[in-house]
């Protein structure tokens, strides 16, 4: 069974005027129109969602900057430095982190054009180690997986990803496995990708275990 997050973000939304409501109605009901159709990558969808969450004071989540190795710097003036040569270094942790309802969030964003499975080689050892460390500190850790060809999105708990990655001779997670162990979310408008609905379910699951 695919787990669909329950609940609504309506309680968080500010009152909207008639004109804004008409715009939203037109946008959401026009056939085939959404941000995915406009060619947004998963990263762009998450970034847009994070802006919405921040502006609405729902959550504070940011993308971690990619570290850069500076190789050559010129100083044409004493007060000015010009970087002439630099290289992107491999990120040492994950893509995003932040706080929501007092809980620490840490997660990866991954997408594939495969239709039946997600390759585990897309996860690196340092990412698995980092997610494991955050889980030990009771953080909420997960991966947002997009099957681009299917336009399907899943919020998959890090614990499931870690176990699959560590399993000997396992090269991928099947779509069925992801369906059975994740919360599926739908792309939309305000926010573009409502992944916090899945986090609400993670929080509820933990509270039931206490």
UniProtKB/Swiss-Prot annotation:
Its main location: cytoplasm. One of its GO terms (molecular function) is magnesium ion binding. InterPro entries: Resolv_RecU, Restrct_endonuc-II-like, tRNA_endonuc-like_dom_sf. Pfam families: RecU (PF03838). It is an enzyme of class 3 (hydrolase). HAMAP family: RecU (MF_00130). GO terms for biological process: chromosome segregation; DNA recombination; DNA repair. SUPFAM superfamilies: Restriction endonuclease-like. The lineage of its organism: Bacteria, Bacillati, Bacillota, Bacilli, Lactobacillales. This is Holliday junction resolvase RecU. The record marks 110 as: Transition state stabilizer. GO terms for cellular component: cytoplasm. NCBIfam families: PRK02234.1-5, recU. It comes from Lactobacillus helveticus (strain DPC 4571). Endonuclease that resolves Holliday junction intermediates in genetic recombination. Cleaves mobile four-strand junctions by introducing symmetrical nicks in paired strands. Promotes annealing of linear ssDNA with homologous dsDNA. Required for DNA repair, homologous recombination and chromosome segregation. It is found in: Cytoplasm. Transmembrane segments: none annotated. Belongs to the RecU family. It comes from the Bacteria.
